[in-house]
UniProtKB/Swiss-Prot annotation:
It is found in: Cytoplasm. It comes from the Bacteria. The keyword Transcription regulation does not apply. Belongs to the adenylate kinase family. It comes from Pseudomonas syringae pv. syringae (strain B728a). The keyword Cytoplasm applies. This is Adenylate kinase. Pathway: Purine metabolism; AMP biosynthesis via salvage pathway; AMP from ADP: step 1/1. InterPro entries: Adenyl_kin_sub, Adenylat/UMP-CMP_kin, Adenylat_kinase_CS, Adenylate_kinase_lid-dom, P-loop_NTPase.
């Protein structure tokens, strides 16, 4: 079973990815991890990718597809794979298709932008311990102060509202065409099965919807 999992930053994609990989015994594959592993192993593709990255270039889709083919040939991918952060663009989705790498499921965890902004911009972190609070959902006893040490809490740059909104706009610009691409493919070929899963509610509720979509 080959699954593409889509979801905006803060939509809870990581939690569901963990569930899917454990439930179905398939690895989560990200292009970043694959690139790092190939460069470290000094494979032919890894060396090509390294020379491109060292010169400040972007690794081509053809090279990424080559890495994916190599990765899918490994024994732990025998039952399938969960793609994380790939494809991001229509050319990448077309390259997957042209390489004969069929996808069985495309899941999108969908959460309203304002809900994501609320989730992420309210996060506060205690730098020393990594403890995470939230101004609304999990506030510290004293505003802006870590419960244990009494030290100040920080807001990560990634969680600043302006940054969150920018990341969301990038996500939508990339993902909307992808969802349309796979929906048309499903209408034409009956595959992949495309599912739009509301990402609001308890983790258990969302997981149940994911499981139903994959069954």
């Amino acid at each position: 079973m080959r699954v593409i999992l889509l979801g905006a930053p803060g939509a809870g994609k990581g939690t569901q990815a963990k569930f899917i990989t454990e439930k179905f015994g398939i690895p989560q594959v990200s292009t970043g991890d694959m690139l790092r592993a190939a460069v470290k192993a000094e494979t032919e593709l890894g060396l090509k990718a390294k020379s491109v990255m060292d010169s400040g270039g972007l690794v081509s889709d053809d090279l990424i597809i080559g890495l994916i083919k190599d990765r899918l040939a490994e024994p732990d991918c025998a039952n399938g794979v969960l793609f994380d952060g790939f494809p991001r663009t229509i050319p990448q989705a077309e390259a997957l298709l042209n390489a004969g790498l069929e996808i069985d499921h495309v899941l999108e965890i969908a959460v309203d932008d304002e809900e994501i902004v609320k989730r992420m911009s309210g996060r506060r972190v205690h730098e020393g311990s990594g403890r995470i609070y939230h101004t609304i959902f999990n506030p510290p006893k004293v505003e802006g102060i870590d419960d244990v040490t009494g030290e100040p809490l920080l807001q990560r740059k990634d969680d600043v509202e302006e940054t969150v909104r920018h990341r969301l706009s990038v996500y939508h610009a990339q993902t909307k065409p992808l969802v349309e691409f796979y929906s048309k493919l499903e209408a034409k070929n009956g595959k992949p099965k495309c599912s739009h899963i509301p990402g609001v509610g308890s983790v258990e509720d969302i997981t149940a919807k994911v499981l139903k979509a994959l069954s």
